[in-house]
Each structure stands twice: as C-alpha cells, then as structure tokens.
C-alpha cells in the first residue's frame, strides 16, 4: 500500500495559469447544513474556498446561508427549496452532506446527479449502498463508524484491515473511498490503494471532516479525477493539521485553524 507524501500532491496539482479566471477553477454546489449544524456548512465552505475552487454555491436553508454569508462573503447561494428547478448546467461537482441532517431529498439529489458527486456524513447516512450511482464519479468520505453502518461490517473487523474493506466496497459500487481514521485509506476501482499518515489527535473534533469534504470537493470541481482529488484533499488536510498542532498544540487547535497553515505548504512550493 502506497504511503502518500506532499510530493504526490504537488505532482498532481496544476499551477494556476496567469490567464485564468474564476470559471477556470470550477463551480461547486454544496448541499449542506441544517438549523442544528450551521457550522458544518461554514466549515465545508471554508475548506472549499481555501483550496481554490472558482465559484462556491451553498444550497441550504435561510438560516444556514446567513451563517455562511456572515463568515464568507465570497460564497454564493441557492435556497434549498429552489434546488429542483435551478439551472445547474455550469456546476462541475456537487457536495452533499456536512451537517445536512435528515433530509428526505438526499436520495433524489443523488439519483438526479449528472456531475461528480462527493458524499459525506449525512449524505451517506440517508442512503443505502444501492442508492449510490454506479456510473462512477462518486467519492464517499466515511469515518469508520459510518462505513460500518453503510456496509454492515463491524468496526473491529474494519479496523483489522481497512484497506481490504475499502477496496472491496470501491470495486463493488464503483466509487472512490476515503476511509477516515488515524491513518486514512484512499482507494478507487482502477487505482492502487494508498494511505495518508498525516494528521494528529488534534483533529478529533467535530468539524474536521466537514473541512476535509470541502477540500476534496473543491479539487474535484476544479477538474481533478476522483482519486486525485481525494489524495490532494486528504494529504493537505492532514499536513496542515500537523503544522497547526506545532503552532497552537493538539489540545487547543480547532478544525478551522488548520486552514491558516495551508498557505505555508503552498508558499514553500511557490504556489
């Protein structure tokens, strides 16, 4: 199993072209958040914008959109009740989950999706594996507990051989799997299984996964493949968390703090 490095990330990521514009870096639609988890929408949006997506549109309730707008004036918005009739022809990826709560419309969103789809947290908890489109272009980002619910395999069995179970699920359902744990396993049907050993216990807080999902979705919206987007998002998330722990400490760091260490990684490589 390949152990990922930051060199792998920057071998994948193209430099931003001098003659580019916001349309050059994709349009991400994030169906996220509910009244109880407004912060999840904010955090996933921060993760997406800080990793370079050209246009982010947050689709949610008024109270969630207000929370995101207060924090991130760069975001655009689509009321949740307008999603079914909206023109999504320019959207290059959809993120579904991240504090969405129990939303009966999730299965329909997934069924109707014609662009790359990233499913996190409640985006996964509201469906069965059979609901996942078999056409490919789907990334799922479960932690061990969510993966256990999704597969029916016990947590102890998954922990004993995460790469095996992630690969089997990936091949059976034609998806890219980001199986989150202290070491995060990434696999897809046609690519080798890899592991990211970046990250630390300072990430063991609510909200860390929301930022990761936003980062992965951002890279997918920018045109990276499912697997490459998962690799770049996961490694950068963990590596910036390690820098953050050095700067603040694992005990006191918060999930959004890691985004202020991303610039160090990019600046060191002239990006």
Task: Please tell me what each predicted stretch does.
Residues 1-116, 125-139, 148-271:
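Small-residue (G/A/S/T)-rich helix-start motifs and N-terminal tracts that mark the onset
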């Amino acid at each position: 199993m390949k152990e990922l490095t930051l060199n792998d990330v920057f071998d994948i990521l193209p430099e931003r072209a001098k003659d580019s514009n916001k349309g050059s870096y994709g349009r991400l639609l994030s169906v996220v958040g509910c009244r109880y988890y407004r912060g999840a929408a904010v955090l996933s949006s921060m993760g997406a914008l800080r990793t370079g997506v050209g246009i982010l549109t947050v689709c949610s309730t008024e109270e969630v959109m207000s929370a995101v707008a207060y924090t991130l004036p760069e975001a655009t918005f689509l009321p949740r009740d307008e999603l079914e009739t909206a023109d999504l022809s320019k959207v290059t990826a959809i993120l579904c989950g991240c504090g969405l709560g129990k939303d009966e419309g999730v299965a329909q969103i997934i069924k109707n999706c014609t662009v790359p789809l990233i499913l996190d947290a409640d985006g996964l908890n509201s469906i069965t594996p059979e609901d996942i489109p078999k056409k490919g272009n789907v990334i799922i980002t479960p932690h061990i507990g969510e993966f256990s619910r999704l597969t029916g395999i016990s947590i102890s069995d998954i922990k004993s051989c995460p790469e095996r179970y992630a690969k089997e699920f990936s091949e059976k359902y034609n998806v890219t799997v980001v199986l989150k744990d202290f070491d995060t396993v990434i696999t897809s049907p046609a690519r080798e299984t890899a592991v990211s050993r970046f990250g630390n216990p300072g990430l063991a807080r609510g909200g860390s996964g929301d930022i990761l999902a936003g980062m992965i979705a951002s890279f997918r919206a920018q045109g990276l493949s499912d697997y490459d987007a998962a690799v770049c998002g996961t490694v950068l998330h963990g590596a910036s968390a390690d820098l953050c722990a050095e700067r603040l400490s694992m005990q006191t760091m918060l999930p959004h703090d890691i985004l202020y260490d991303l610039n160090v990684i990019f600046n060191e490589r002239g990006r």
